[in-house]
Design a protein with these regions (language model features):
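Hydrophobic alpha-helical segments
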Residues: 1-114
């Protein structure tokens, strides 16, 4: 489990849920609204130039506000930035245990240096 997943597992108190979502959103125990959001974010990750108003309407019709979409897109974009920066900078990979420890710290204190 990597850093952002470890934070999500810590905040949810449910590592099995995070593992299930990462394995396959559609068969995970997420509710339909969250599955719709994850489908949309997957498109942001892989097909952002082809996103249309119809894509946004599908997520809105699942119950998400424009503000929620703004934050979801922003978090997605920031995570992509950080992941690419780390990949390209030669920062060494951390162990799963180090990610879990960092996840607990980030869940408790936020994404700040402690």
């Amino acid at each position: 489990m990597k850093s952002h997943a470890a934070v999500a597992a810590e905040l949810l108190g449910d590592e099995a849920m995070v593992t299930a979502v990462l394995a396959d959103v559609e068969s995970s125990p997420l509710d339909d609204a969250h599955k719709a959001l994850f489908r949309f974010i997957d498109r942001v990750n892989h097909e952002s130039p082809s996103i249309t108003e119809a894509d946004l309407e599908r997520v809105r019709s699942a119950g998400w506000s424009d503000e929620a979409l703004y934050f979801a897109i922003t978090v997605c974009a920031l995570f992509n930035f950080y992941n690419r920066w780390i990949d390209a900078s030669g920062v060494h990979a951390l162990s799963d245990e180090a990610h879990r420890h960092g996840g607990k710290r980030s869940a408790q204190y936020g994404y700040v240096r402690t």
